[in-house]
């Protein structure tokens, strides 16, 4: 992550800034690499940037944010959906549950506890920097355009169900 957020003071500053609605979105530096590829090189400057994190990003925000009263569930929704949809010109098709929107929704269980592992999400990556973190609050079901596409860490949607979402151009 560039820049890294390491100190307790930095972490506290980020959460307080989010709580005050001064940060619009939270993203990941997700790069689905295997550890041997990431570390392939002689110096830190040779290492590949980023790390696999998209699979735990929502659980981290639920566990460390909502469940520790650093942010509200409404703020989380804005950070992860509404604001991004508006910024990227996809609102109201995305980021909204209003009539004529796609009404995509992720159901979460704020009490579900699970350890983060690379095996949890399958795929190419064989590591996570959050290995064995016990997180409380996980997504349990994702619905896209009325169809369940993910349930209990498993993709259950039909291949090819994705759809291009046209963006509105921004006027300058």
Identify the residue ranges that each predicted region occupies.
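C-terminal cap of metal-dependent C-N hydrolases
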Residues: 39-43, 102-165
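A short acidic, glycine-rich active-site loop
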Residues: 1-9, 48-53, 129-134
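Short, solvent-exposed cationic patches
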Residues: 164-172
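His/Asp/Glu-enriched, well-ordered alpha-helical/loop segment
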Residues: 19-26, 31-110
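Juxtamembrane/interface motifs at transmembrane-helix termini
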Residues: 95-99, 120, 171
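Histidine/acidic residue-rich metal-binding segments in metalloenzymes
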Residues: 1-26
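Short, flexible, glycine/charge-rich loop motifs used to bind or transfer phosphoryl groups or to couple energy/partner
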Residues: 14-16, 95-96, 132
């Amino acid at each position: 992550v560039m820049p890294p957020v390491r100190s307790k003071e930095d972490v506290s500053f980020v959460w307080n800034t989010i709580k005050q609605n001064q940060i619009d979105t939270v993203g990941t530096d997700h790069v689905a690499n295997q550890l041997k590829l990431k570390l392939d090189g002689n110096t830190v400057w040779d290492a590949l940037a980023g790390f696999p994190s998209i699979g735990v990003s929502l659980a981290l925000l639920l566990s460390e944010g909502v469940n520790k009263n650093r942010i509200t569930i409404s703020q989380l929704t804005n950070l992860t959906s509404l604001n991004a949809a508006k910024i990227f010109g996809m609102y109201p098709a995305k980021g909204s549950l209003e009539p004529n929107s796609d009404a995509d929704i992720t159901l979460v269980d704020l009490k579900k506890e699970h350890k983060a592992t690379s095996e949890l999400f399958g795929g190419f990556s064989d590591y996570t920097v959050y290995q064995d973190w016990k997180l409380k609050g996980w997504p349990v079901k994702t619905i896209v355009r009325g169809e369940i596409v993910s349930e209990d860490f498993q993709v259950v949607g039909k291949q090819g169900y994705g759809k291009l979402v046209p963006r509105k151009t921004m006027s300058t």
